[in-house]
């Protein structure tokens, strides 16, 4: 049983970049994750993001990552106990993809905030100063992230990252559902923008730049600032 629990926790830690965040444990001792609740209604981000997109994105897309990730955890739990190393290696792809999808979307929901509650208000305080220092201005950061997101081939994410060792902020991109930690162990996500088509196609069709330009109106910079200050505290 101890080996099973350890294997599951190690797999979860891999996807989360070294910090396991269990939500529940089954009777077998397998650590699983759960779909997080949103702090706002599906339609609260309109007209920037439609309620239909938010409902499908959360209830279907993210929920599927959770189901498939938990399934992969159960499977790797079994093959580790059996000592089947080749099966463990084969499951890493499913764990990375679905675990990354869960991690990335859990951050994404926190990065969004209704306009009526302060969404879109530019960053202030220490994060605002860091952005000015590392990018020249807030407007320059937005332009850079929009350009990186528009240029990203296929599906993926564009991130505002904090390098906790260098104490610098940077723009990073990751393919598919790769979490930011795959670009460097010292990188902490402050903001992530989902540029998979499921995040915008029903509303913006194939015009990804329009989606990128508009999403800043519902960005939760208060959350990003809190993460920044907590990491560097």
Swiss-Prot record:
<keyword id="KW-0809">Transit peptide</keyword>
<feature type="binding site">
    <location>
        <position position="57"/>
    </location>
    <ligand>
        <name>Mn(2+)</name>
    </ligand>
</feature>
<dbReference type="GO" id="GO:0005739">
    <property type="term" value="C:mitochondrion"/>
</dbReference>
<dbReference type="InterPro" id="IPR019831">
    <property type="entry name" value="Mn/Fe_SOD_N"/>
</dbReference>
<feature type="binding site">
    <location>
        <position position="194"/>
    </location>
    <ligand>
        <name>Mn(2+)</name>
    </ligand>
</feature>
<dbReference type="InterPro" id="IPR036324">
    <property type="entry name" value="Mn/Fe_SOD_N_sf"/>
</dbReference>
<dbReference type="GO" id="GO:0006970">
    <property type="term" value="P:response to osmotic stress"/>
</dbReference>
<feature type="binding site">
    <location>
        <position position="198"/>
    </location>
    <ligand>
        <name>Mn(2+)</name>
    </ligand>
</feature>
<comment type="function">
    <text>Destroys superoxide anion radicals which are normally produced within the cells and which are toxic to biological systems.</text>
</comment>
<dbReference type="GO" id="GO:0004784">
    <property type="term" value="F:superoxide dismutase activity"/>
</dbReference>
<comment type="subunit">
    <text>Homotetramer.</text>
</comment>
<feature type="transit peptide" description="Mitochondrion">
    <location>
        <begin position="1"/>
        <end position="29"/>
    </location>
</feature>
<feature type="binding site">
    <location>
        <position position="105"/>
    </location>
    <ligand>
        <name>Mn(2+)</name>
    </ligand>
</feature>
<dbReference type="InterPro" id="IPR036314">
    <property type="entry name" value="SOD_C_sf"/>
</dbReference>
<dbReference type="Pfam" id="PF00081">
    <property type="entry name" value="Sod_Fe_N"/>
</dbReference>
<dbReference type="GO" id="GO:0030145">
    <property type="term" value="F:manganese ion binding"/>
</dbReference>
<keyword id="KW-0560">Oxidoreductase</keyword>
<dbReference type="GO" id="GO:0009737">
    <property type="term" value="P:response to abscisic acid"/>
</dbReference>
<dbReference type="InterPro" id="IPR050265">
    <property type="entry name" value="Fe/Mn_Superoxide_Dismutase"/>
</dbReference>
<dbReference type="Pfam" id="PF02777">
    <property type="entry name" value="Sod_Fe_C"/>
</dbReference>
<dbReference type="GO" id="GO:0005759">
    <property type="term" value="C:mitochondrial matrix"/>
</dbReference>
<dbReference type="InterPro" id="IPR019832">
    <property type="entry name" value="Mn/Fe_SOD_C"/>
</dbReference>
<keyword id="KW-0464">Manganese</keyword>
<dbReference type="InterPro" id="IPR019833">
    <property type="entry name" value="Mn/Fe_SOD_BS"/>
</dbReference>
<keyword id="KW-0479">Metal-binding</keyword>
<protein>
    <recommendedName>
        <fullName>Superoxide dismutase [Mn] 3.3, mitochondrial</fullName>
        <ecNumber>1.15.1.1</ecNumber>
    </recommendedName>
</protein>
<keyword id="KW-0496">Mitochondrion</keyword>
<dbReference type="InterPro" id="IPR001189">
    <property type="entry name" value="Mn/Fe_SOD"/>
</dbReference>
<comment type="similarity">
    <text>Belongs to the iron/manganese superoxide dismutase family.</text>
</comment>
């Amino acid at each position: 049983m101890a080996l099973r629990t350890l294997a599951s926790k190690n797999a979860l830690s891999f996807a989360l970049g070294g910090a396991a965040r269990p939500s529940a444990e089954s009777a077998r001792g397998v650590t699983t994750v759960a779909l997080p609740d949103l702090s706002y209604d599906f339609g609260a981000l309109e007209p920037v993001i439609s309620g239909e997109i938010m409902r499908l994105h959360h209830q279907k897309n993210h929920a599927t990552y959770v189901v498939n990730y938990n399934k992969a955890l159960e499977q790797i739990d079994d093959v580790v106990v059996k000592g089947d190393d080749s099966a463990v290696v084969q499951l890493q792809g499913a764990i990375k993809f679905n675990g990354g999808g869960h991690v990335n979307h859990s951050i994404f929901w926190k990065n969004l905030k209704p306009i009526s509650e302060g969404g879109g208000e530019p960053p202030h305080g220490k994060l605002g100063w860091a952005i000015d220092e590392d990018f020249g201005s807030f407007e320059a950061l937005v332009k850079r992230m929009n350009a990186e997101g528009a240029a990203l081939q296929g599906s993926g994410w564009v991130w505002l990252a904090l390098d906790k060792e260098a104490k610098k902020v940077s723009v990073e991109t990751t393919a598919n559902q790769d979490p930011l930690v795959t670009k460097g162990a010292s990188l902490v996500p402050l903001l992530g923008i989902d540029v998979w088509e499921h995040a915008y196609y029903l509303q913006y069709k194939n015009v990804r730049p329009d989606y990128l330009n508009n999403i800043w109106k519902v960005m939760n910079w208060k959350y990003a600032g809190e993460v920044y200050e907590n990491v560097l505290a």
